[in-house]
């Protein structure tokens, strides 16, 4: 299920564009996640009170958390599948502290793909979308395996 070198190049090329405005991308990803899957908002005590898209856009905390999420994901993507050291603490915190189900990781993966499609259509064609989908699936599968080791049925 690994990616080819060419697929990793496509992933990292578009990710460079994400990193140029990580806060903006992170904010958009979280807003899309919360709009498309409102149940995910319940996992975020800090954001539960944000009811409208305008409130979400005005939240510095949401923008900051979006940067944190995409920053961590970027670090994982740059490892090109050799991300054991990065995945382990992330799975630990998301299983034991935050209790984030794998399904929610699927939801945020969808949000990432949609945001990249809307912001970078010229650099995110079918090949790049397919490569990013595979990379995010690899990430989710590895998180799910760690969840299982930890006894979390997320």
UniProtKB/Swiss-Prot annotation:
One of its GO terms (biological process) is removal of superoxide radicals. Gene3D superfamilies: 6.10.140.2100, 6.10.140.2110. Residues 2-148 form the Globin domain. It is found in: Cytoplasm, Sarcoplasm. InterPro entries: Globin, Globin-like_sf, Myoglobin. GO terms for molecular function: heme binding; metal ion binding; nitrite reductase activity; oxygen binding; oxygen carrier activity; peroxidase activity. Heme b binds at residue 94. Nitrite binds at residue 65. It is an enzyme of class 1 (oxidoreductase). Its main location: cytoplasm. Belongs to the globin family. This is Myoglobin. The lineage of its organism: Eukaryota, Metazoa, Chordata, Craniata, Vertebrata. The gene is MB.
